[in-house]
Amino acid sequence: MPRYKLTIEYDGSPFVGWQAQTNGRSVQQVLEEGIKGFCGQELKIFGAGRTDAGVHALGQVAHVDFETPVAPDTLRDAVNAHMRPHPVAIVEAEEVPDSFEARFSAVKRHYMYRIVNRRAPLTLDRGQAWLVHKTLDADAMHDAAQALVGNHDFTTFRSVQCQAKSPVKTVDEISVSRYADEIEIVCRARSFLHNQVRSFVGTLKMVGDGSWTRRKVEKALAAKDRAACGPVAPPDGLYLLQVDYE
C-alpha cells in the first residue's frame, strides 16, 4: 500500500483539536472525510502533533496509506476540494517509504506563538493571536526564556492531564522577537509535553510585563510543581509551524 506524507495548514478556531473526538469536529475528521470523498474509502490519517482546540498549524504533517497509487498533486487537489468550506488545506503531498511515520519519524517540532501587544482590539487577527494590552519587554522575555532551554524536568510547565511517561524533555531553542506591535515566540524541540509551549508563553508574558524576573522563572522550573507555573496562554496564538525529518 503506497504511503503519502501530507503537509497541512489549518485554522484551529472551529475545531476541538487535531484528534478525532466525540464532542465536536476535529481536523483529523475533516481530512478523513475529504479523503473518503476523493477515493470512497475510510482511511486512517496519522498526525505528527495532536494540537489542542483552537491551536493552528502552518506545517502539520500526517501520513496516510492508500490501497492503490495516486499522483500526489491529484491527491492534494482532490482532497482539498472535498474539504471545502472547512479551513483546512493540504499544502503538499508526496509519496514516502512505508517506514515513514509522521509522529515517530519526526526529529524536531517548531511551534510559534503570536502576541499582539497594543491597546486596540484585534480585527483581522481575532482568534489568531493573544491580545495583550500592557507593554511587554520582549528582550527581557527572550533572556528569561533561555532558562528554559536544555534538558530539564518540566513538571512545572506541563498540564496535569499530560500523559507523557516522563516530564523530562530537551528544549533546543526558544526565541522571543518583536516586530512592531507583534511579539513572536518560537520554540523548537524533538517533542513537547501537553500545554508546555502555552505554559512557557504565559510565564514569559509575566516577565514581559514586569511581574516576574528571570530568577523567578528559574525557581519555577526548579520547583517541579505545576502550581509554580505562570498562567497558561490561550490557544489562539499558537501555531505548529514545522516538523523536521531526517
From Swiss-Prot:
One of its GO terms (biological process) is tRNA pseudouridine synthesis. Substrate binds at Y111. GO terms for molecular function: RNA binding; tRNA pseudouridine(38-40) synthase activity. Pfam families: PseudoU_synth_1 (PF01416). Keywords: Isomerase, tRNA processing. Gene3D superfamilies: Pseudouridine synthase I, catalytic domain, C-terminal subdomain, Pseudouridine synthase I, catalytic domain, N-terminal subdomain. The active site is at D52 (nucleophile). InterPro entries: PsdUridine_synth_cat_dom_sf, PsdUridine_synth_TruA, PsdUridine_synth_TruA_a/b_dom, PsdUridine_synth_TruA_C, TruA/RsuA/RluB/E/F_N. It comes from the Bacteria. Its EC number is 5.4.99.12. Belongs to the tRNA pseudouridine synthase TruA family. Formation of pseudouridine at positions 38, 39 and 40 in the anticodon stem and loop of transfer RNAs. Homodimer. This is tRNA pseudouridine synthase A. It comes from Parvibaculum lavamentivorans (strain DS-1 / DSM 13023 / NCIMB 13966). The lineage of its organism: Bacteria, Pseudomonadati, Pseudomonadota, Alphaproteobacteria, Hyphomicrobiales.
